[in-house]
């Protein structure tokens, strides 16, 4: 898989895609800090698609999140400098459906998307349109 520094990507912004030399980028873009990585992100056809990772200045993991078609989809986790989990979140098509947060190792939030939440209707609409798109592509 192609790997390159993220400053070699162009983001014109008019279509939401990242490009390398005028072509939507597929591969891994990374950002270095000092002697190590600060961040890396997988792309497919110009969209964030795969794993997004960041590191603290010490080199310890800061976050790992999954994306599909440019939005968070799947497990999202964050850690503090001591390696303690601070966020454990599940997203679906860009909508958070479940989240736990910790501060100094103590659980401070345990939340789940409820049918009464505004984002619930958004998620239902996204599911419908996403599945329709897969069917039209012959993947569903």
Sequence positions of predicted segments:
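Glycine/tyrosine- and acidic-biased, solvent-exposed loop/turn segments at the edges of beta-strands
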Residues: 1-140
């Amino acid at each position: 898989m192609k790997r390159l520094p993220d400053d070699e990507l162009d983001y014109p912004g008019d279509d939401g895609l990242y490009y390398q030399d005028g072509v939507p980028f597929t591969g891994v873009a990374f950002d270095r800090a000092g002697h190590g990585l600060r961040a890396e992100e997988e792309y497919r056809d110009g969209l964030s698609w795969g794993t997004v990772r960041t590191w603290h200045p010490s080199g310890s993991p800061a976050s790992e999140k999954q994306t599909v078609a440019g939005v968070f989809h799947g497990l999202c986790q964050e850690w503090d400098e001591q390696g303690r989990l601070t966020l454990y979140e599940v997203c679906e098509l860009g909508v958070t459906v479940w989240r736990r947060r910790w501060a100094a190792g103590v659980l401070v939030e345990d939340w789940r998307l409820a049918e009464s939440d505004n984002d619930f209707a958004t998620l239902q609409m996204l599911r419908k349109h996403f599945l329709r798109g897969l069917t039209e592509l012959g993947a569903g």
